[in-house]
Regions:
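Membrane-proximal helix-turn-helix segments that form the acceptor-binding/catalytic region
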Residues: 23-24, 111, 122, 144-147, ...
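A short, active-site helix/loop in glycosyltransferases that binds the activated sugar's phosphate group
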Residues: 194-222, 426
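Carbohydrate-associated surface elements
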Residues: 207, 228-229
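A conserved catalytic-core segment of Leloir-type glycosyltransferases
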Residues: 40-118
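N-terminal subdomain of nucleotide-sugar transferases
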Residues: 1-65, 200, 206, 273, ...
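Nucleotide-activated donor-binding/catalytic signature segment of Leloir-type glycosyltransferases, i.e.
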Residues: 283, 287-320
Length: 431
C-alpha cells in the first residue's frame, strides 16, 4: 500500500506522536509498503527527504514560536533533545512566550499549529495529485492535522481516511486548546465534520470512545480503540552513566501538561518521605527525564529538602530514555486529571517489568486500568497524600528494591502493544 501520514512533527522532534508513528512507519516500510509523511518545516532540514525509507515532506510552521526559531536559525529548541532546560530560558524566550500567551493564544484557531494549515493543505493536495495513495492517516493533536486530512478527503472521496485521535478536541475543557468563549460552537462543528467524513476513527482508550459517543451520538460505531505502542526495536544507549551505583533510583519519564498533569503531588509525597523516613535521604535519587516548562519548574523550587536528591535531565534521545528505564530501580507515573487520556509511555512502563509508583488523579483511572493486575504497582490518590500514603511508599520501596518481572511475564503482558500488532490494527482499519 502507498500511505500518507499527516502529523505536525517528525524526527528530530521528540514527542509521543513522533515516537508512535515513526515506529509504525518504519514497520510498514519493512513490510514493503510505501510511506509518506507530511509534517512542518524545521530550519536546517530539507523540505523533502528520506529517513529510514520514509519519504518526508515538510511545509508550514509548527507554531508561532517555532516560526521565530526558524527565522532566527535557532537549533536548540523545545521538544528536541538538547533543548534548553528551564534554568537556561533567556529573556527573549520568556518574552516571546508572554507575547504568545497574551495575544496570539486568545485569537488563533483551531490550535497553536494553525500556521501549518494553509501550506500543509496545499502540499497535501499536491501530493494527492502526484501519488495515488491507498490510504491516509491524520494524527491529532493538533486538530489542524485533521483539517488538512478533511481537505484531502473532500478532494478525493475515494481515498480511505483514518482519523487517529491521540488527544480529543472539541469537548476538552481541562486544558487550553483555543479560546472557547469565541470558538466553542465552531470547535464542535469542525470536529463533527471530520468525524462524519472519516472512514475510520482510532482512539487510545475505551473511555475516549465512550466520551466521543456522548458528545457525537452514533459515531462510536466507527471508532476503534488502538492502545499505546511499545517499540521493541529501541535499543538502550550502551554508554549510559546517569545513575550512581548503590542508590535507589526513582525515575519519571515524560512531560508535564499543566493543569492536567503536574509534579506537585509527587514532590509533596517525596518530600514527606524524606521527612518521615530520613533513612532514604542518603540513597534515594529522583530523576525527571523530559521537557520541563519554565512555569512548571517553580514547583520543584518549593521543596528545598528534595533538591540534593533531584536530577532534572531535560529532554534526551530515546536511546537514553531506554537506558534510564533499564537501569532505574523504580518508575514513577503521574496520572492525568482527565479520564479520556492514556499516557503513551504506559506501554513502555509495562514492558520494563520494573516496580511502578503511580499517583492517581482521576476516576476512572486509565493507567490503573491499563496496568490491570500488575503485581508491582503501588497506586496512591493525589488528594490523599499524607502520612499513610508516605508509609505505604516507604514499605513499597523496601519490599521491591531491585525487583523485576520475569522475561516471560513481561512478554505475555506486552505482546498486544508491540509495534507490529499496532501497525496491523491500523492497516485493518484502512482496508
Amino acid at each position: 500500500m502507498r500511505l500518507l501520514i499527516i502529523l505536525a512533527q517528525y524526527h528530530p522532534a521528540l514527542n509521543p506522536n513522533v515516537y508512535r508513528w515513526r515506529a509504525i512507519a518504519t514497520h510498514w516500510i519493512a513490510q514493503g509498503h510505501e510511506v509518506h509523511v507530511l509534517c512542518t518545516k524545521r530550519s536546517g532540514l530539507p523540505d523533502e527527504a528520506v529517513l529510514e525509507g520514509v519519504q518526508i515532506h515538510r511545509a508550514g510552521q509548527n507554531s508561532l514560536l517555532d516560526w521565530f526559531y526558524n527565522l532566527l536559525y535557532i537549533t536548540r529548541r523545545r521538544g528536541e533533545a538538547g533543548g534548553d532546560l528551564p534554568s537556561r530560558h533567556g529573556a527573549l524566550r520568556k518574552g516571546l512566550e508572554k507575547l504568545v500567551d497574551i495575544g496570539w493564544r486568545s485569537l488563533y484557531w483551531p490550535d497553536g499549529r494553525c500556521l501549518w494549515h494553509r501550506p500543509g493543505k496545499k502540499r497535501a493536495l499536491h501530493l494527492l495529485k502526484t501519488y495515488p495513495f491507498d490510504g491516509m492517516i491524520s494524527v491529532g493533536a493538533p486538530f489542524t492535522a485533521h483539517l488538512i486530512g478533511l481537505a484531502c478527503k473532500r478532494s478525493d472521496k475515494r481515498l480511505k481516511w483514518l482519523v487517529d485521535i491521540e488527544d480529543p478536541f472539541a469537548f476538552v475543557d481541562a486544558y487550553f486548546i483555543n479560546n472557547r468563549l469565541l470558538y466553542r460552537r465552531l470547535n464542535f462543528r469542525a470536529e463533527a465534520a471530520v468525524l462524519e467524513a472519516a472512514d475510520a476513527i482510532a482512539v487510545t482508550v475505551d473511555t475516549a470512545k465512550e466520551t466521543y459517543g456522548h458528545y457525537f451520538p452514533g459515531i462510536e460505531t466507527n471508532v476503534t480503540v488502538v492502545p499505546p505502542l511499545f517499540d521493541p526495536t529501541l535499543v538502550a544507549a550502551p554508554d549510559f552513566d546517569g545513575f550512581e551505583p548503590g542508590c535507589i533510583h526513582l525515575s519519571y519519564l515524560g512531560a508535564f501538561y499543566a493543569p492536567i498533569r503536574t509534579p506537585d503531588a509527587a514532590l509533596k509525597l517525596l518530600n514527606l518521605l524524606l521527612e518521615r523516613h530520613p533513612e532514604f535521604q542518603p540513597r534515594l535519587r529522583i530523576h525527571f527525564f523530559g521537557e520541563i516548562e519554565y512555569a512548571v519548574k517553580a514547583a520543584f523550587e518549593q521543596y528545598p529538602r528534595l533538591l540534593p536528591n533531584l536530577h532534572l535531565h531535560g529532554l534526551v534521545e530515546r536511546e537514553q530514555v531506554a537506558a534510564a528505564m533499564a537501569n532505574t530501580t523504580f518508575l514513577l507515573n503521574i496520572g492525568n486529571t482527565t479520564t479520556y487520556n492514556l499516557p503513551s509511555k504506559s506501554a513502555d512502563y509495562l514492558a520494563s517489568g520494573k516496580p511502578v509508583i503511580h499517583l492517581s488523579a482521576s476516576e476512572p483511572d486509565t493507567f490503573v486500568a491499563f496496568m490491570a493486575d500488575h503485581p508491582m504497582l503501588l497506586s496512591l490518590k493525589t488528594e490523599a497524600i499524607g502520612a499513610e500514603a508516605t508509609d505505604l511508599l516507604a514499605k513499597f520501596l523496601a519490599d521491591f528494591e531491585n525487583r523485576q518481572l520475569s522475561a516471560e511475564a513481561i512478554e505475555a503482558r506486552i505482546k498486544p502493544y508491540r509495534a507490529a500488532q499496532i501497525a496491523e490494527a491500523y492497516l485493518r482499519m484502512l482496508e
